[in-house]
């Protein structure tokens, strides 16, 4: 159907439901967006998935996080054992969760984890390099991560899946997100850097100092979004970008989580601008950089719950709102079918 014709048809269907026009607020714009993504006036959500990409960061060794980098691989075990917040929310909402080793500094090949049905081995390397010294990734590694992300979207997600959320796990990755955001949006680092997983004031100041040094070292040589990603990103961020772009090409709804996932989306959007129409921004994080990212697209996130967890938790929590948008569009009576008089 012609997009302009579909907009008219969807908007008419929304407006003729037994309610005052616009009274369902964001649910109405969300129903319209989902219908346009799926090119139908009767959309549905099939086989929802959330992918959690895990990777370590060389910069974590410099003290930019409140937690040791071992927490990354420990949380991978926790995800696969069903014990994390994202597990609880996925179970609550019947969402399939898959965990991707994009670049964790740990070998899972000697463990039964390697055979877990929800574990995806896509390791590019055992963590990125320390960006205080050199770029996080080589050009080849960055391309490999992007390609593996696209492969996962194509081969490791159910073929009938039409809605997919993106989460991450990686000690130190809020630092990468801050550097990506500052570099691409031309913002001062202090405007886009928060305390991450809970740094005290002294350690937060140390984080700022380290990130300013990283930016000063590399910024003059960065000309493209790819170069920003290669220099400041992580394997999990790059792989997420590849999966986002591929999923959008497949006509899926893209659920964007918090600060790190949205910094990945920033690069994805620079690489493939059409991806924006598929994106649903699930929540507003307390990380200051996230607010600047959302402002880049004038995005209105579905939730504002003070989240700063990652893992794709915001995607899972917001998912029932998408279900509600679909439910009213498909199941609510129209004025005509219900024999209810419309506004005079």
Curated annotation (Swiss-Prot):
Q: Which GO terms describe its molecular function?
A: nicotinate-nucleotide-dimethylbenzimidazole phosphoribosyltransferase activity
Q: Which UniProt keywords apply?
A: Cobalamin biosynthesis, Glycosyltransferase, Transferase
Give the positions the UniProt entry annotates as the active site.
311
Q: What domain of life does the UniProt record list for this protein's source?
A: Bacteria
Gene Ontology terms describing biological process: cobalamin biosynthetic process
EC identifiers of the protein: 2.4.2.21
- Whether Amino-acid biosynthesis counts among this entry's keywords is no
> Which pathway is this protein assigned to?
Nucleoside biosynthesis; alpha-ribazole biosynthesis; alpha-ribazole from 5,6-dimethylbenzimidazole: step 1/2
Q: Give me the reactions it catalyses.
A: 5,6-dimethylbenzimidazole + nicotinate beta-D-ribonucleotide = alpha-ribazole 5'-phosphate + nicotinate + H(+)
**What InterPro entries does the database record attribute to this sequence?**
Nict_dMeBzImd_PRibTrfase, Nict_dMeBzImd_PRibTrfase_bact, Nict_dMeBzImd_PRibTrfase_N, Nict_dMeBzImd_PRibTrfase_sf
Q: Which family does it belong to?
A: Belongs to the CobT family.
According to its UniProt entry, the function of this protein is described as: Catalyzes the synthesis of alpha-ribazole-5'-phosphate from nicotinate mononucleotide (NAMN) and 5,6-dimethylbenzimidazole (DMB).
Instruction: List the PANTHER family.
Output: NICOTINATE-NUCLEOTIDE--DIMETHYLBENZIMIDAZOLE PHOSPHORIBOSYLTRANSFERASE
Q: Cite the NCBIfam families for this sequence.
A: cobT_DBIPRT, PRK00105.1
This protein is called what? Nicotinate-nucleotide--dimethylbenzimidazole phosphoribosyltransferase
Gene name of the record: cobT
């Amino acid at each position: 159907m012609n997009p302009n014709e579909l907009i008219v048809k969807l908007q008419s269907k929304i407006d003729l439901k037994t309610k005052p026009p616009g009274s369902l607020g964001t649910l109405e714009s969300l129903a319209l967006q989902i219908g346009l993504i799926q090119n139908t006036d009767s959309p549905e959500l099939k086989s929802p998935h959330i992918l959690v990409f895990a990777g370590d960061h060389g910069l974590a060794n410099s003290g930019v996080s409140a937690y040791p980098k071992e927490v990354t691989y420990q949380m991978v075990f926790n995800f696969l054992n069903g014990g994390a917040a994202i597990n609880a929310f996925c179970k609550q909402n019947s969402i399939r969760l898959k965990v991707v080793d994009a670049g964790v500094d740990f070998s899972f090949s000697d463990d039964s984890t390697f055979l877990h049905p929800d574990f995806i081995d896509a390791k590019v390397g055992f963590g990125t390099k320390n960006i205080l010294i050199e770029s996080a990734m080589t050009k080849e590694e960055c391309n490999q991560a992007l390609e593996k992300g696209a492969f996962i979207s194509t081969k490791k997600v159910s073929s009938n899946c039409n809605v997919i959320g993106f989460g991450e796990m990686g000690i130190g990755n809020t630092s990468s997100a801050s550097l990506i955001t500052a570099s691409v949006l031309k913002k001062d680092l202090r405007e886009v850097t928060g305390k991450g997983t809970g740094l005290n004031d002294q350690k937060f100041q140390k984080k700022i100092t380290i990130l300013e040094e990283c930016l000063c070292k590399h910024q003059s040589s960065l000309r493209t979004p790819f170069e920003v990603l290669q220099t400041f990103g992580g394997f999990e961020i790059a792989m997420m970008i590849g999966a986002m772009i591929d999923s959008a090409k497949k006509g899926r709804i893209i659920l964007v989580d918090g600060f790190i996932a949205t910094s990945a989306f920033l690069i994805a959007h620079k690489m493939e601008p059409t991806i924006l129409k598929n994106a649903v921004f699930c929540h507003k994080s307390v990380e200051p950089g996230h607010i600047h990212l959302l402002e880049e697209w004038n995005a209105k996130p579905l939730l504002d719950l003070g989240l700063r967890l990652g893992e794709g938790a915001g995607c899972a929590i917001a998912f029932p709102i998408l279900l509600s948008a679909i439910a009213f569009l498909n199941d609510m009576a129209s004025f005509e079918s219900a024999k209810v008089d419309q506004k005079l």
